[in-house]
Amino acid sequence: MERNPILAAMGGYPLAEIQMRARDLREAGAPLIDFSIGDPREPTPAFIPEALKDAVPSISQYPTTAGLPELRTAIADYLRRRFGVSIDPATQIIPTAGSKEGIFHTPFAFIEPGAGQGVVYGSPAYPVYERGALFAGAEIDPIPLSGDFVLRASDISDRSWERARLVWSCSPHNPTGSVTSNEDLVDLLERSRSEGALFASDECYVDVYEEDPPGSVLQVAGPDLAGTLAFYSCSKRSGMTGYRSGAIIGDAEAISALIDLRASAGLAPPEFVQAAAVAAWSDDQHAADRRVIFTAKRSVLRKAFEQVGLPVVASTAALYLWVAVGDDVAVTIKLLEQGVVVSPGRAFGPGGEGYIRLALVPTLEECEVAVDVLVECLDE
């Protein structure tokens, strides 16, 4: 059967291929410690599934695309606590079925297919920026990131700015864990506005950090959030990867366009999932508790790489360690053969070659076991 040519050209999702190889090893009986996919092993805080169960109705009804008012209010309250910003829950917030689908579908609301409009993002990058852009009919424009893996307005050429319709930033950054300063966010946002481009800030990991809390574009965009979208998720903050719950916050006109798009596709999280998200966004302590666990894992693994003289680059926030190893494919295969699954940096696009990414998803105990394998394999 013939496939959409875009789908045929891009092949499988990069990390899915790694998972297939790992699955084959598991089926052969090999024990694996898996750092490849950002799906933490810590239990979801008990009050969250309780809220979900309490909200399951006896009669099923379609959810509204705009989402429950209670959820939009809970998200606005969280943003006020976290960033000191005032967001209108009625016009500036829309829930999504996780941030991934929101990120993928956003270009469909703003791109004119085949018109040569550019979607700009730093590379290496979360693969969904590229994939959503291509399926929406945009021209992709990956910008090579410098040594600190932070995208800055000055990194983007005038030619790229001229054709840009959508500009992505990601902070804390996937795959590297770098953090973009508010000053750099201001520069990106102001240039995007001056060029007539929509600025989209992926902030899904903003509550996963070691010391200094990362900022948000919402703090610098002004009360109307003109030309701005920010993307949030319950997945890592609250251990809700399987619930599929996120949100887009931003410019009321852009949110309205997204509601129209999403209504056409029936993209709305179930209301019992939204009820669980209300509980999650209303509580900050569980996010702080999880942060302690991720910091402990990061420390254990960083020491292992330091022991064998391999630099951990950036990696002060988000869920990832980004390690310079030389031949990322060879190292990935070597570790896989020894029972440790990591992601080769090139899976995240140009600029990822020579690095591996480790997601802080195994338990702390598993991380400690993995250290011995890492040291033995990488010290050779």
Predicted region positions:
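Short, surface-exposed alpha-helical recognition segments that flank or form part
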Residues: 9-10, 63-66, 176, 289-292
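Conserved PLP-binding active-site segment in aminotransferase class I/II-type PLP enzymes
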Residues: 1-11
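A glycine-/small-polar-enriched, mobile loop at the entrance of the PLP active site in fold-type I
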Residues: 33-40, 54-73, 82
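PLP-dependent class I/II
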Residues: 3, 16-32, 38-52, 82-380
